[in-house]
Amino acid sequence: MNPLLSFCNVSFGYEDRDVIRSASFDLQAGSCTALIGPNGAGKTTLLRLAAGILQCRSGNVILNNESLYKFAIRDVARMVALVPQQLDIPFQFTVREVVEQGRTPYLGFLRGPLREDRMAVDRALELADVTELQQRVFNELSGGERQRVKIALGLAQQPRLLLLDEPTQNLDIGRQIELIDLLHFLHSEGITIFASIHDLQLVNGNFSSALLLSPDMPLMSGTPEEILRPSLLEKAFNCPPQRHPLLLERTQRSEKRAG
């Protein structure tokens, strides 16, 4: 089966500094993949490359068996949606008005929203469980509510691939669990999920595959169990196992098996 998205020896940098170096990996259709790595490793940059917002310096990004750069921006946005960390809305837009912006790739120069656009917005609100918030002002919502609305905005694009940039950041544990449950549900609906995750303890058991991005080592891909090995994480995060509960727990488990 051909991957939905592939990075083929992709490099990208700002001015004279490379952020992504010779990155290669595949995202299979229907997969649920976590992207982990230390701050400043380039996770946001990698997601923006996957969404076609940035263009790689060398290599290629393949989307649905074609070079992503052969597609018009509108066509990429119909297949891939990026949920950013921050969404700044300068006006007092309602939740519904924000989510309606996700239909932009489908609107023509002289064509306003059609019935199918309204239905897509209704469905996105429903999937993200924010239908009851649709008449609320976006800027007056809590952090957890805003996160769900941002996901609804992405879903209104009706993408095959949903990219999320640290969706659980700044959420308390209850809200984190709710959001992970939402990602599980969207995955069950056939949407391919690719999310950068700050809390490593959310990765195992919630994602089918994982990528590890670090400035000090090549991009690593595998199952969560393979990627969350203490030896890899210690090198990637420059953190001794005894200083992080997840690393300590996994190191102790490995020692017990060895004994």
Describe these PLM feature segments:
Residues 51:
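Helix-to-loop junction immediately C-terminal to a conserved catalytic motif
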Residues 231-259:
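ABC ATPase nucleotide-binding domains
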Residues 36-38:
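The feature captures the beta-strand-to-loop junction immediately N-terminal to the Walker
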Residues 59-67, 76:
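Conserved ABC transporter NBD signature motif
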Residues 162-166:
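Catalytic Walker B motif of ABC-type/P-loop ATPase nucleotide-binding domains
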